[in-house]
Amino acid sequence: MRKLALFCGIFILLMSFTTFNFKTEIPFNGGFTSMTIDTLFKDRISIRAILIDKNKVWYGADNSRFGYYDLDKKEKFEEHIYRDTLKLEFRSIAQTSKDIFLLSVANPALLYSVSKNDRKVKLVYKEINPKVFYDSMQFWNDKEGIAIGDPTEDTFSIIVTRDGGETWTKLLSDKLPTNSTGEAAFAASNTNIVIKGNDTWLVSGGKKARVFYSPDKAKTWKVVETPIVQGKQMTGIFTADFYDSKQGFIAGGDYDLPNNKANNKAFTKDGGKTWQLIGQNMGFGYASCIQYVPGGNGREIVCVGSEGIQYSQNGGENWMQLSTDTKFFTIRFVNRNTAIAAGHNKVVRLNFK
């Protein structure tokens, strides 16, 4: 969903930066007993899109920047993509075994592939429209991927690739469910799309908060209503995750009322056919990103948002405060005991014990 203007580009600059390493010990009760926070690097940067690629944490950022942090070598590398005098903001990132893909949010939308081998950058998709605003991107496999954007007509803007990201095609509106007036998506943490096998879930916000489901990699769709708060421009589902094909969790709330903890989180046990509110007036208010803990049997969830980092060990009913730092926008797990969080001016490693 549009919140600021963007600028676009292409010129590559390789940079390395000094690593910062600050540690904080936070004791708490639950499935884990303690957590340490290691600051991997700090910079003047806004990061809402990250992914884990073996020993590297790749990121897309503001001011035409992307890069990675090598967890083994403890080194950061960063590049810029410039086009004319404009800049890009990358809020969507995805990968295949060979390439990283970065998608900018606003007009014109530019999608780049970046070779993991030599970091060569290639423009693979461009869309010009005053209403264009892309929110999230994922791959089903090494050949097929999908990205979702706000409606430019009366449906979500959905582009797909079937050739490993070499070419992308926008799905025709008559093949997609119609969005309600004022229904769009939020580019908060690259978690508007969740994929498990061939199953795909997209989440919406604004005047409506719904889940769009495809069982066949975006060929057909069904839409499900949810009880998440909705009705205003900045309400709805901001983030989603599925533990498996049946257990899922959605969260969000009201961005303008970030302390409101009601009607902002819900779960499913049937693959998204039905959703039930949970944790009413408990835990967090506005949620930017939620992720299931690997190996937690769908019971353990971590959230980053307006009240910091919080953890649930009972499926979202109760929440424990892990950190009061509110500057994180997104989080991904490396394994059960390690996660990476990023946001305003920093990237950190969370070590759960």
Residue ranges and their predicted role:
Residues 39-64:
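Beta-strand-rich domains and repeat architectures in extracellular enzymes and scaffolds
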Residues 27-40, 63-83, 108-128, 158-177, ...:
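Asp-box/BNR beta-propeller loop motif
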Residues 41-42, 84-88, 129-134, 177-187, ...:
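Short glycine-/Asp-/Thr-/Trp-enriched loop segments that recur within the blades
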Residues 333-353:
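Blade-level signature of beta-propeller repeat domains, shared across WD40, Kelch, NHL, RCC1
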